[in-house]
């Protein structure tokens, strides 16, 4: 009969005007059951490692993407969706409580506090949060001609100012290689060899930076075209040596990561990271140490983002 079942009845709460989509009424037990059952089915029956929840900010804020008059404040006059907040706490408590080792990952683009905090500490309870700030600063820096990178040096160091505010995952996701944004290789400046050299440096810096890692498929062998769900990856590129070299380089970085605890065991502890020199602006060099918990198996990273050799 057209009566809203899963969404809010009031269109000011039940619709996203920009997307033309409905918003779940998280206060309804049947909606909560439907969503949590779906999450559990994927993890417990299909055995996926975890779930990434898209556009979390759109659920947390009642005024997300809306103008004055298009939204209704909560009972306290604020713009927080209290039902959605309670739902996320419940969802993550149930899923992670029943499935040890599973991951619940939030794609959340604002400064909402404690996204990965424990629900009993008023956190949302996610395992990891996408580090959207790092991703934006990092990709914008890497697009620059090395000659001009000195003017954007701070973009590569700023992420360490907030790196421990959440349990972050560094993401170079599908969102960054679609809609005319270019593949990771074609984001790099220069021609031919220069693009591949820049990509190697980028992946090395990412490996050393605190936070878990996510690299979208195809970028590990330097896919040329943007990703499209309508075709497979361009696997034929692996017949060419530069693409083989990138794949081997990324394999080696993963091996380095897996076999060196300094790269992950203190990811959420400031004691695990130390700048050696973050202010070498003129030469566009970043140097830092990743510390292991016992401080005996530390790793030094020196990343040079110019094509100039720096023997010292």
Task: Mark where each language-model region is.
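Substrate-binding/active-site clefts of carbohydrate-active enzymes
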Residues: 1-79
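Conserved alpha/beta catalytic core and glycan-binding cleft of carbohydrate-active enzymes
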Residues: 13, 47-49, 64-229, 258-268, ...
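Residue-level preference for long, well-ordered alpha-helices that form the structural scaffold
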Residues: 28-31, 35, 76, 80-84, ...
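Alpha-helical packing segments of well-folded alpha/beta enzyme cores
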Residues: 31-42, 87, 91, 202, ...
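Aromatic-rich peripheral "rim/lid" segments of glycoside hydrolase catalytic domains that contact
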Residues: 228-240, 250
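Catalytic cores of secreted or luminal carbohydrate-active enzymes
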Residues: 241-267
